[in-house]
């Protein structure tokens, strides 16, 4: 009776979502495809991402208000470049092409795309032409946008007009009669000025969409899906103490109660005193936490390993080994839950394998292909800021919810090169000093992520009258909304001076401290 009721509820929810007019994102492999969906969901409109090769018949059966063609790593003239059925443009549904999507529109309609003599990556200034278009309604004549392209439009197709340009390329085109639009830049990226307004113009003024999506209703759906999928089976979850795994744990607990078993694996690669902080969660949130000290095993497996991808794979494999040993003690454990989020999935690989892999994430790229446990990832379609909002709704305290992210592989990917116990000890002390000073100076919650990287580079120094030859540490602090793009944090010089002085004087093994001032893109937040 209970499960019949749940199935009925899910049927109602699925029927509701099928009847909602959605914005459809056709994914051509861009690292930002899901971010487009995030931006539009943020303004209250249901958005779905599907592979570009989805059959036209399926698309016709969807209730769509508008279609967005994402960017992608390919050139439209490359062999086997992703393409599109021209019938898409005969559905009388507005279409917006972004970057590769715009170039594909130009090619399909008979225009010309060529290789740039000057590629554009990063910030550029855009200028609007004196052409009336709803796409740029209520926008100034010039503003900053984010570019990321190696090809450009050389000749626009017949019946299209140019809406905007930069000093190097045609930045936007449109066919107003057919409601087909193109942008060479990325409005979905937070550092593109007025990007949200451009998307709002497309969604509300051109597609005539209505607000129909809320985070709260989506969370309720996820809880019911967990109940239906897991049933009476048990779920095992690796609890790291980070925001993602804690929110994941409380969501699953809400769905299956005592059938959730949280496992805290001490890998020896954690922040200083991390084990004590995580075990405190047991009492704060009434979680069933099993503690396992596997620090020696992890360190032995990482011996002589320098390649970051190999380190991630080894750690992921050993995590699964630990969990599967636990399941031998309880045959009713059938699922391995992870706090995988959208940005993890995007940076590892696109679901359709069209995107260029940046790096594998421990949650998605570090697990072995064959394992007995089934995977449960209730957060893998949410971005970090959405997860924080879910955490607020679940009653998670500020100090737990706004802790700076910590990667699954831990300090192994903040120690560049081989991992040793000596390096772990050095890095733990250095990161602890940085965190202490951030709290002391009321800066911790002003920064989204702060950590220290230990380089495999030694340099000469002088302490007292003695020559030193020790490691170099790099401080990395960033601010970001969604972790898809990020800017380095401009910290006060006096603060940096204090942190540097403390690390060099208090941490044996470091005699030089640098500050990383690179943004994402082109850099990633973590070094490995």
UniProtKB/Swiss-Prot annotation:
Domain Glutamine amidotransferase type-1, residue spans: 22-212
Transmembrane segments: none
Residues of the GMPS ATP-PPase domain: 213-403
Positions with a binding annotation for ATP: 240-246
GO cellular component: cytosol
Keyword field: ATP-binding, Glutamine amidotransferase, GMP biosynthesis, Ligase, Nucleotide-binding, Plasmid, Purine biosynthesis
Catalytic residues in the record: 99 (nucleophile), 186, 188
GO terms of molecular function: ATP binding; GMP synthase activity
Reaction equation(s) it catalyzes: XMP + L-glutamine + ATP + H2O = GMP + L-glutamate + AMP + diphosphate + 2 H(+)
Pathway: Purine metabolism; GMP biosynthesis; GMP from XMP (L-Gln route): step 1/1
EC id: 6.3.5.2
Lineage top rank: taxon: Bacteria
PANTHER family (alphabetical): GMP SYNTHASE [GLUTAMINE-HYDROLYZING], GMP SYNTHASE-RELATED
Quaternary assembly: Homodimer.
Job description of the protein: Catalyzes the synthesis of GMP from XMP.
UniProt-recorded name of the protein: GMP synthase [glutamine-hydrolyzing]
Native organism taxonomy: Bacteria, Pseudomonadati, Spirochaetota, Spirochaetia, Spirochaetales
Gene name in the database record: guaA
């Amino acid at each position: 009776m209970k499960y019949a009721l749940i199935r009925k509820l899910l049927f109602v929810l699925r029927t509701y979502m099928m009847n909602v007019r959605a914005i459809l994102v056709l994914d051509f492999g861009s690292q930002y495809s899901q971010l487009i969906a995030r931006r539009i969901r943020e303004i209250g409109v249901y958005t779905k991402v599907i592979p570009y090769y989805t059959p036209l018949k399926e698309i016709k059966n969807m209730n769509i208000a508008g279609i967005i063609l994402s960017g992608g790593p390919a050139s439209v003239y490359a062999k086997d470049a992703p393409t599109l059925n021209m019938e898409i443009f005969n559905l009388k549904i507005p279409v917006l092409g972004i970057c590769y999507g715009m170039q594909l529109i130009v090619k399909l309609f008979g225009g010309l795309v060529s290789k740039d003599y000057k590629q554009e990556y990063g910030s550029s200034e855009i200028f609007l032409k004196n052409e009336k278009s709803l796409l740029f309604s209520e926008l100034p004549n010039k503003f900053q946008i984010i570019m990321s392209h190696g090809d450009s439009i050389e000749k626009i197709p017949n019946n299209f007009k140019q809406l905007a340009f930069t000093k190097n390329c045609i930045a936007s085109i449109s066919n107003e009669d057919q409601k087909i639009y193109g942008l060479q830049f990325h409005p979905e990226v937070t550092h593109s000025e007025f990007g949200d307004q451009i998307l709002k113009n497309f969604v509300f003024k051109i597609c005539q969409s209505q607000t129909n999506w809320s985070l709260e209703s989506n969370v309720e759906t996820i809880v019911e899906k967990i109940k239906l999928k897991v049933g009476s089976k048990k779920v095992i979850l690796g609890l790291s103490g980070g925001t993602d795994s804690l929110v994941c744990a409380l969501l699953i607990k809400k769905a299956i109660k005592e059938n959730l078993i949280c496992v805290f694996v001490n890998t020896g690669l954690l922040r200083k005193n991390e084990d004590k902080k995580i075990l405190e969660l047991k009492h704060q949130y009434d979680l069933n936490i099993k503690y396992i000290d596997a620090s020696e095993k992890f360190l032995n497996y990482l011996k002589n390993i320098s390649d970051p991808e190999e380190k991630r794979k080894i750690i992921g494999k050993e995590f699964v080994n630990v969990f599967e040993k636990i399941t031998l003690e309880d045959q009713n454990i059938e699922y391995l839950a992870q706090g995988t989020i959208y940005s993890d999935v995007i940076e590892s690989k696109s679901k359709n394998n069209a995107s260029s892999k940046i790096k594998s994430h421990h949650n998605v790229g570090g697990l072995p292909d064959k394992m007995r446990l089934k995977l449960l990832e209730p957060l893998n379609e949410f971005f970090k800021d959405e997860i924080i909002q879910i955490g607020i709704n679940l009653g998670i305290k500020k100090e737990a919810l706004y802790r700076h992210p910590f990667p699954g592989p831990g300090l192994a990917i903040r120690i560049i090169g081989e991992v040793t116990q000596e390096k772990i000890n050095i890095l733990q002390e250095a990161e602890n000093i940085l965190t202490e000073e951030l709290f002391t100076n009321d800066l911790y919650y002003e920064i989204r992520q702060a950590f220290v990287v230990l380089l495999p580079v030694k340099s000469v120094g002088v302490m007292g009258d003695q020559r030193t030859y020790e490691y170099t540490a790099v401080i990395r602090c960033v601010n970001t909304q969604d972790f898809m793009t990020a800017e380095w944090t401009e910290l006060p010089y006096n603060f940096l001076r204090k942190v540097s002085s403390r690390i060099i004087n208090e941490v044996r093994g470091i005699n030089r401290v640098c500050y990383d001032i690179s943004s994402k893109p082109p850099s990633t937040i973590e070094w490995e």
